[in-house]
């Protein structure tokens, strides 16, 4: 009985390590990320691609109300997987830090600098009592002085830099597809195609344009740009990934 009570203390206490060195609440937050729909990031010499699966849970839901990719600054985009409300809080924090940097130094914030400020903020919530970890992972992508950068954050507050990465549901399958098909010399268009192929790789049906978000930050312009549904549809159609009417009827 006493052992069970001690186990529950480790389980519930965010600031208490278990005897084997684990923080259970942080691990549970990682499980929340796995339950979220996938987001994919691809870094190419021509820029960064962010793509997110945003298939709605019901045909009655407005697809435009589901946002998975956000603009943090003119040259930075953020994609999320996990609790949407937690993601919104972190994205707002990232936007504030970006603006503070512009006001203080008169220049855009660096991608690595912003990522570390966000992860420092996340990490504080793994050490403070009376709070819980953020149940979300982020992909922070952008261009800094002509160099594309792509980072992942996780609920522990650890940053990782990637060439291509997936977060959220089916991460293992998506990551396997990325590892098999990624090349260091990908163009930006090929990066978009790879991200869409990775998302589609875990679905028996095709992908609808309103079921996925895609954004890029070009190394040439250093500008965050979201693709329209028509542009996404053209990429899906060109790569034989577009959902047909038969697929949509099957889903329903």
Swiss-Prot record:
GO molecular function, one term: endopeptidase activity
Name of the molecule in the record: Proteasome subunit alpha 1
Subcellular location: Cytoplasm
Activity under varying temperature: Optimum temperature is 75 degrees Celsius for the Suc-LLVY-Amc hydrolyzing activity (with the alpha1-beta proteasome subtype).
Organism annotation: Haloferax volcanii (strain ATCC 29605 / DSM 3757 / JCM 8879 / NBRC 14742 / NCIMB 2012 / VKM B-1768 / DS2) (Halobacterium volcanii)
Pfam family, one: Proteasome
Keywords: Acetylation, Cytoplasm, Proteasome
Family annotation (SMART domains): Proteasome_A_N
Effect listed in the UniProt record for changing residue 2 to A: Enhances cleavage of PsmA1 by methionine aminopeptidase (MAP), resulting in acetylation of the N-terminal alanine. Enhances peptidase activity of the proteasome. Renders the cells less tolerant of hypoosmotic stress than the wild-type
Regulation: The formation of the proteasomal ATPase PAN-20S proteasome complex, via the docking of the C-termini of PAN into the intersubunit pockets in the alpha-rings, triggers opening of the gate for substrate entry. Interconversion between the open-gate and close-gate conformations leads to a dynamic regulation of the 20S proteasome proteolysis activity. In vitro, the chymotrypsin-like activity of the alpha1-beta proteasome is potently inhibited by carbobenzoxyl-leucinyl-leucinyl-leucinal-H (MG132) and significantly by N-acetyl-leucinyl-leucinyl-norleucinal-H (calpain inhibitor I).
InterPro entries given in the database record: Ntn_hydrolases_N (IPR029055), Proteasome_alpha (IPR050115), Proteasome_alpha-type (IPR023332), Proteasome_asu_arc (IPR019982), Proteasome_asu_N (IPR000426), Proteasome_sua/b (IPR001353)
Modified residue annotations for N-acetylmethionine: 1
Membership in a protein family: Belongs to the peptidase T1A family.
A Gene Ontology BP annotation from the UniProt entry: ubiquitin-dependent protein catabolic process
GO cellular component, one term: cytoplasm
Role noted for this protein: Component of the proteasome core, a large protease complex with broad specificity involved in protein degradation. The H.volcanii alpha1-beta proteasome is able to cleave oligopeptides after Phe, Tyr and Trp, poorly after Glu but not after Arg. Thus, displays chymotrypsin-like activity, low caspase-like activity but no trypsin-like activity.
Miscellaneous comment text of the record: H.volcanii proteasome requires high concentrations of salt, similar to the extracellular environment and cytoplasm of this organism, for complex stability and optimal activity.
């Amino acid at each position: 009985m006493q052992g069970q009570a001690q186990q529950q203390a480790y389980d519930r206490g965010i600031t208490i390590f278990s005897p084997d060195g684990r923080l259970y609440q942080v691990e549970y937050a990682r499980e929340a990320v796995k339950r979220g729909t996938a987001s994919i990031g691809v870094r190419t010499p021509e820029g960064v691609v962010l793509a997110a699966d945003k298939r709605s849970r019901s045909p009655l839901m407005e697809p435009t109300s589901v946002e998975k990719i956000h603009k943090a600054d003119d040259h930075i985009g953020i994609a999320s997987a996990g609790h949407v409300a937690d993601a919104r809080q972190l994205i707002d924090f990232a936007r504030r830090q970006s603006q503070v940097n512009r006001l203080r130094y008169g220049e855009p914030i660096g991608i690595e600098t912003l990522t570390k400020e966000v992860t420092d903020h996340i990490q504080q919530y793994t050490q403070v009592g009376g709070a819980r970890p953020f149940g979300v992972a982020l992909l922070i992508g952008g261009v800094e002085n002509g160099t594309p950068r792509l980072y992942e954050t996780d609920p522990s507050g650890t940053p990782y830099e990637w060439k291509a990465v997936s977060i959220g549901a089916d991460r293992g399958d998506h990551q396997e597809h990325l590892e098999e098909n990624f090349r260091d010399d990908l163009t930006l268009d090929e990066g978009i195609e790879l991200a869409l192929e990775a998302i589609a790789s875990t679905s028996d049906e095709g992908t609808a344009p309103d079921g996925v978000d895609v954004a890029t930050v070009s190394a040439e312009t250093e500008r965050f740009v979201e693709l329209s549904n028509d542009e996404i549809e053209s990429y899906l159609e060109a790569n034989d990934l577009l959902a047909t009417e038969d697929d949509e009827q099957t889903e329903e």
